[in-house]
Swiss-Prot record:
Binds 1 zinc ion per subunit. This is Methionine--tRNA ligase. The lineage of its organism: Bacteria, Pseudomonadati, Pseudomonadota, Gammaproteobacteria, Enterobacterales. The keyword Cell wall biogenesis/degradation does not apply. Its cofactor is Zn(2+). The gene is metG. SUPFAM superfamilies: Anticodon-binding domain of a subclass of class I aminoacyl-tRNA synthetases (SSF47323), Methionyl-tRNA synthetase (MetRS), Zn-domain (SSF57770), Nucleic acid-binding proteins (SSF50249), Nucleotidylyl transferase (SSF52374).
Length: 676
């Protein structure tokens, strides 16, 4: 039965235009591209778009440091990003920029509608201001002495020595990172989006059943803690769009960034002339809209974005497809270890299809982190693609080319086996469609094993030596070629370059519907190597090329001690005053109004403590901490913060930011036990 083609618009999160694409970015773009290519193979009308996120203070300041205009910097970065994505065969229909006229017009339209509908509120807030640069300073653009441990050179939101969190106004001797000047406190009127007004709508959307369970659960936590109004404005100087009717005020980057999805699509519509923008974005649109995003930006896409769309009379997303992070060899990507790998560096040493396949073999519809184990990567690609799939073609093509002038047999040697492959297409299609990529790969490789068993059992190399069995030889090898064709059709969304070479060899396009009709009495091309085995030397070269060049510096001391020297010696009596206890993390949640803090509820053996900890960058999904044991300083004097009372401090190691690691006791430790 012929299905009606769907109209689908697919986006990936917009890469920020101040840095290169790395393998963490590539997980999302590969995942989305596989899904898009599959949908296209099934006859659906799919538009796949992206853009660079090109606004904000970091871009403005980096351009100043480089001595170029922000417009030039983001244009250069856009070209680099597009080259990287093209190298990985990401099949975008359009790649644009948030710094565009389309995005400006749509941002102003959405803001104006929100304001007219009463969803924009004004109020005055106090911020640190750089008198030399004439600009308000974000938290990370202020440094000073920690008010808690008195360590110098700490950021304006948390101390990387003692992990204390605070507001920039609490810093001792604060200085502007931009100019070195002493900032002053200054009031400014800001504009806020009234997110709480959309709480009922958002909760209904959450309960619709479309969202991933993990996303819906996290959203419910946010609803339970209460939604807050969202500051959508920034003061000049700022690289972005000025707010209509508010000179010197600019849209915060996170307002116009998701509107960039619309801007990129509008740009495509205008260039093509045959796509109706409103058919995809109007309130009653029957098109499907999907955003592939990382778990670190769920808050913006599940709350702010649908609320903004609802309040401005546009349609909401059909769904969010959220993925986890990428680790390499079991750890966070590291420049010093050579595992912080840029997309361009990968392509200088290895092919794109290999990474696409490995990611597909590990991806599911859940929000799980993916580990790129480089040794396993080599073994898996060689075992699956070289030894199973490509070898199936090579071991049969030689006989067909040499003995039968490239012509396949008129009949299938084993129709029942071929029917098994046809029947499997339904399950594999469902796996691709539901983003259960690892299941699809497992099923495909199981059938690749079955195909190779067939060839092993039929032993064409033996049949070739037997008189009068030419017809059997042709039928056996033709069967092998046909099974290879089906396998490659299933893998076409994952490995487009290999699929293209397979199509040239088969003299036939690989189409999903074509699986049901085997190639009979058909001429294939002379066989050429379709895919080369990956050698570990290539991977070692990739790692070496990715390492930071630290040899020139030749520091006397390297490692953590160089960055954080030992403190002055203290007496045992002083140490004995510190009461450290094992604590069970009963609950962990984001803190509204802070992009650095987590609120932890700790059980220390019958007593509950509320602790604010500046570890959000390292643990962006706090739900993963629930149930863990950690170590806390239990007799630290409670500290009143603007978010509440913090009743202790959890212990963590690392330089700070994303590179901080919560301490955990060995198995057997119990909440409340003293650390001695």
């Amino acid at each position: 039965m012929t299905q009606v083609a769907k109209k689908i618009l697919v986006t990936c999160a917009l890469p920020y235009a101040n840095g290169s694409i790395h393998l963490g970015h590539m997980l999302e773009h590969i995942q989305a591209d596989i899904w898009v290519r599959y949908q296209r193979m099934r006859g659906n009308q799919v538009y796949f778009i992206c853009a660079d996120d090109a606004h904000g203070t970091p871009i403005m300041l980096k351009a100043q440091q480089m001595g170029v205009a922000p417009e030039q910097m983001i244009a250069d970065m856009s070209q680099e990003h597009q080259t990287d994505f093209a190298g990985f065969n990401i099949s975008y229909d359009n790649y644009h920029s948030t710094h565009s006229e389309e995005n400006r017009e749509l941002s102003e339209l959405i803001y104006t509608r929100l304001k007219e509908n009463g969803f924009i509120k004004n109020r005055t807030i106090s911020q640190l201001y750089d008198p030399e640069k004439g600009m308000f300073l974000p938290d990370r653009f202020v440094k000073g002495t920690c008010p808690n441990c008195k360590s110098p050179d700490q950021y304006g939101d948390n101390c990387e020595v003692c992990s204390a969190t605070y507001s920039p106004t609490e810093l001792i001797e604060p200085k502007s990172v931009v100019s070195g000047a002493t900032p002053v406190l200054r009031d400014s009127e800001h504009f806020f989006f009234d997110l709480p007004e959309f709480s009922a709508m958002l909760q209904a959307w959450t309960r619709s059943g479309a969202l991933q369970e993990q996303v819906a659960n996290k959203m419910q936590e946010w609803f339970d803690s209460g939604l807050q109004q969202w500051d959508i404005s920034r003061d000049a100087p700022y690289f972005g769009f000025e707010i209509p009717g508010a000179p010197g005020k600019y849209f915060y980057v996170w307002l116009d960034a998701p509107i960039g999805y619309m801007g990129s699509f509008k740009n495509l519509c205008d260039k093509r002339g045959d796509i109706d923008f409103d058919a995809f974005w109007q309130k009653d649109s029957d098109a499907e809209l999907y955003h592939f995003i990382g778990k670190d930006i769920v808050y913006f896409h599940s709350l702010f974005w649908p609320a903004m769309l609802e309040g401005s009379q546009f349609r909401k997303p059909t769904n969010l497809f959220v993925h986890g992070y990428v680790t390499v060899n079991g750890a966070k990507m590291s420049k010093s270890r050579g595992t912080f790998i840029k997309a361009s560096t990968w392509l200088q040493h290895l092919d794109a299809d290999s990474l696409r396949y490995y990611y597909a073999a590990k991806l599911s519809s859940r929000i799980d982190d993916i580990d790129l184990n480089l040794e396993d990567f080599v073994q898996r690609v060689n075992a699956d693609i070289v030894n199973k799939v490509v070898n199936l073609a090579s071991r049969n093509a030689g006989f067909i080319n040499k003995r039968f002038a490239g012509q396949l047999s008129a009949e299938l040697a084993d129709p029942a086996l071929y029917q098994t492959f046809i029947d499997a297409s339904t399950s594999i299609a469902q796996a691709w469609s539901s983003r259960e990529f690892s299941r699809a790969v497992r099923e495909i490789m199981a059938l690749a094993d079955a195909a190779n068993r067939y060839v092993d059992e039929q032993a064409p190399w033996v049949v070739a030596k037997q008189e009068g069995r030419d017809a059997d030889l042709q039928a056996i090898c033709s069967m092998g070629i046909n099974l290879f064709r089906v396998l490659m059709t299933w893998l076409k969304p994952v490995m487009p370059s290999l699929a293209e070479r397979a199509e040239a060899f088969l003299n036939q396009p690989l189409t999903w519907d074509g699986i049901e009709q085997p190639l009979l009495n058909h001429n294939i091309a002379a066989f050429k190597a379709l895919y080369n085995r990956i050698e570990m030397d290539k991977v070692n070269g990739l790692i070496a090329a990715s390492k930071e060049d630290t040899a020139a510096a030749q520091p006397a001391v390297t490692g953590p001690l160089a960055d954080d020297p030992l403190q002055e010696t203290i007496s045992f009596d002083d140490f004995a005053k510190v009461d450290m206890r094992i604590a069970l993390i009963e609950n962990a949640e984001l803190v509204d109004g802070s992009d650095k803090l987590l609120r932890l509820t700790l059980d220390i053996g019958g007593e509950k403590r509320n602790v604010f900890s500046g570890i959000r960058a390292a643990y962006p999904d706090p739900a993963l901490l629930v149930g863990r044991l950690t170590v806390m300083v239990a007799n630290l004097a409670p500290r009143k913060m603007r978010f509440g009372l913090s009743e202790g401090m959890v212990m963590a190691a690392g330089p700070g930011g994303k590179d901080i690691f919560l301490l955990s006791p060995d198995s057997g430790a119990q909440p409340g036990q003293q650390v001695k």
